[in-house]
Structures are given as C-alpha cells and as structure tokens.
From Swiss-Prot:
Part of the 30S ribosomal subunit. Forms a tight complex with proteins S10 and S14. It comes from the Bacteria. This is Small ribosomal subunit protein uS3. SMART domains: KH. GO terms for cellular component: cytosolic small ribosomal subunit. InterPro entries: KH_dom (IPR004087), KH_dom-like_a/b (IPR015946), KH_dom_type_2 (IPR004044), KH_sf_prok-type (IPR009019), Ribosomal_S3_C_sf (IPR036419), Ribosomal_uS3_bac-typ (IPR005704), Ribosomal_uS3_C (IPR001351), Ribosomal_uS3_CS (IPR018280). One of its GO terms (biological process) is translation. It holds the Pfam family KH_2. Residues 39-108 form the KH type-2 domain. Transmembrane segments: none annotated. GO terms for molecular function: mRNA binding; rRNA binding; structural constituent of ribosome. Keywords: Ribonucleoprotein, Ribosomal protein, RNA-binding, rRNA-binding. It comes from Alkaliphilus oremlandii (strain OhILAs) (Clostridium oremlandii (strain OhILAs)).
Length: 238
C-alpha cells in the first residue's frame, strides 16, 4: 500500500529550503534541536491569533539567533510602536539565553498558504461548522486567489460518527510526484467534543525551476525586524 510523504521534505534542497539553518557538533546538536522546538512551540502558542504560517530559525557563529516569523497578520505581531515584536524577542531570549533578532514576514495571500488554510478549517470545525462546508469554502477561496490546484482531507469521527473515516475533496491539479511542482503542504488538528480531527491540505502553485539557495516566493514580504545590537540598544526597521 502506497504512503504519502511530506511534500515539503521531499523537495528540500531542490525547490524548497530548510526551515532551520545552523551547524553544531555532536555534543551540542541535541540541545539546539530541542531549543528550536521549544522556540517554535512558544511562538506558535503566543501568536495563535496572528496566523503564523512558518517559523525559520538561523544560528550564527557569534552566538546569535535569528527568528523569521511568517504571518498573515504582521500588525498584530509587531504591535503598537513595535512593542509586540520587542516583547516576543525578549521572551525568546529567555528560552535560548542568546542574542535574538526577530524578523516579521508578511504572507500576502493567506488563502494559498496550506498551513493557514488547514488551521482555518480546524478553527471552523471546533465551532461546529460542517466539515464539508468548511473544506469547500477554503478550496473556492484558494482557487480564486490564484492556486492551480488544492486538495483537502479531514480524518476522524466526522459529524460525530461512531467509526472514524477520512473524507477529502480536490479541485484542479495537484502533481505530488513532480519534484519541480511547488506543492505547499499544511496540517492542523481540531479538538471537538467527539475527539481530535486531523486536517491535511495540499496546494499546487505552479512549477518552478530548481535553483541554488532559497526559492523566492511572491507570497511573502518582509515588513519589519527587531534585534539587539552590541551596545544593548534596540534597533528596529520597518
């Protein structure tokens, strides 16, 4: 029986880039990996209502951590006068015990971001919206926003049924086997009175040619960054 692998992991190094960029020796590797996981969980929990799609972490040799937060609502993350992102930077510094710089990157079209779409469906299911209605709505929005194809699958006790099952819908073309195809994948869970429901989303945005380095996305825009300089003063750019 064939199994589906994560489309992002299959394309890393070809048309996708790593979400974590750093090198470490065997002694420190495990600690840094756990630290990255804690940072991601904290940021995701703190910015739950801000529509965080992806969190990239980079580490430099000078003991500095750079966190790139991809969000659909950058204004909520930055806050009034940049206070929100400054508080976030300080909280991350407490976790990592290192100098931290935070970049806020806007996701221009959240309707075509698979992770945000999956979380949107989960949000609706937790509020007792019909799973079929929720899936079809996000599919229509994605296709109208320029996606070439989308597939959504929901698993669990759908509608409170006794036996769990998987039900999905697709529209357009989603070529999972083509490595040059830009497939955006997202997963989210919905906590309902009948148990957990899992939502998977695949969005096809077109073909891209493999290039060295990160593939530039027309769906993102850097809107601000905050870091701490060597003199301890806050430096902010928008």
């Amino acid at each position: 029986m064939g199994q589906k692998v994560n489309p992002h992991g299959l394309r890393v190094g070809i048309i996708k880039d790593w979400d974590t960029k750093w090198y470490a020796n065997k002694r420190d590797f495990g600690d840094l990996l756990v630290e990255d996981n804690e940072i991601r969980k904290f940021v995701k929990k703190k910015l739950f209502l801000s529509g965080v799609s992806r969190i990239e972490i980079e580490r430099a040799a000078n003991n500095k951590v750079k966190v790139n937060v991809h969000t659909a609502k950058p204004g909520m993350v930055i806050g009034k006068g940049g206070q929100g992102v400054e508080d976030l930077r300080k909280d991350i510094e407490k976790i990592s015990k290192k100098n931290v710089a935070v970049n806020v990157i806007e996701v221009k079209r959240p309707e075509t971001d698979a992770q945000l779409v999956a979380e949107n469906v989960a949000f609706q299911l937790e509020r007792r919206v019909s799973f079929r209605r929720a899936m079809k709505q996000v599919m229509q929005r994605a296709m109208k926003s320029g996606a070439k194809g989308i597939k959504v699958a929901t698993s669990g006790r759908l509608g409170g049924a006794e036996m769990a099952r998987t039900e999905g819908y697709s529209q357009g073309n989603v070529p999972l086997q083509t490595l040059r195809a830009d497939i955006n994948y997202g997963f989210a869970e919905a906590d309902t009175t009948y148990g957990k429901l899992g939502i998977k989303v695949w969005i096809y945005k077109g073909e891209v040619l493999p290039t060295k380095g990160r593939v530039a996305s027309n769906n993102e825009e850097v809107v601000g960054n905050v870091e701490k300089n060597t003199r301890g003063k806050k430096r902010e750019a928008k």
